[in-house]
Amino acid sequence: MPPVAVAAYTATSALGRGVAAQLEALQAQRSGLRANDFGPHVDGAPLPCFIGRVDGLEDAALPAEFAQWECRNNRLAWMALDTDGMAQAVADAIALHGAERVAVVVGTSTSSIGASEEAYARLDGDGDEARFPDDLARPIVHTVHSLGDFLAHATGARGPCITVATACSSSAKVFAQGARLIEAGLADAVLVGGVDTLCGSVLYGFNALQLVSRERCMPFDVRRVGLSLGEAGGFALLRRAQPGDVLQLAGYGESSDAHHMSAPHPQGLGAQRSMADALAEVKRDLGQDA
């Protein structure tokens, strides 16, 4: 594939806001997990588990001009966009290439479903007359594309706008999609990334699958008993590579083994193929035999 540069990047998670906060926490071996203090609660008590919750979202309302997109997920998107100079990097790309040549490709698993949960919990009326409360009667929020639509309006990008929703792979696939848009000549720069926030559907859905650990998760440990859920938002700006670029997208691979609705192939064939295809692409770009 033609060289694609990563011109800017940022991340916000339970570890903190911005790349520096993530690095500091990793170097200090500090976890972002804490005892679950996020609703909705069953019988007055939260689900007994550990979560990675981003502090400050409850007080980080969107600017008034974006009120129709107001929800926890878009709040985190706005917070992440306003970190590490990401919003300015997108603005610079628009100034250089034009708004129609800057695309948005973002991934999300549940998007703004937390707002939909609240709307159903607060229905006005009964039976066939039940309606969402006025403050949540905003159709643009109750769709998986809420994130992509919000970011396009928030940044002013007017190129292709795509929201990828393929569960846990969503925010990885956007790099491949963004690179293809540039390769096809449909965009000169692409804002890629992903945002997912805590909500009842995620917490209780994974718990129903018996996948949520009651203790802090222990990835790769023989004693592991499940996962811990959290929320985070991260973005990168892709563009055609130029001399002197430090960071480039070396390659990507995608597959779908279609083994099971919620479980991978026992031998991980889908993941194997994706990684093999990505490595083969890197070798081709380096002029080596795949």
State where each predicted segment sits.
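Active-site-proximal alpha-helical scaffold in enzymes
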Residues: 87-92, 144-148, 152-155, 160-194, ...
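Conserved active-site "lid/cap" helical segment
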Residues: 15, 20-106, 112-113, 274-289
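Active-site pocket-shaping loop/turn-to-helix segments
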Residues: 64-85, 135-143, 161-173, 218-234, ...
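Condensing-enzyme catalytic core mediating Claisen C-C bond formation in acyl metabolism
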Residues: 3-7, 24-38, 43-50, 216-285, ...
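Phosphate/pyrophosphate-binding betaalpha-module
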Residues: 192-231
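A glycine- and small-aliphatic-rich helix-loop capping segment at beta-alpha/alpha-beta transitions
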Residues: 20-21, 116-131, 151, 181-184, ...
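Active-site-proximal gating segment of KS-fold condensing enzymes and close homologs
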Residues: 108-162
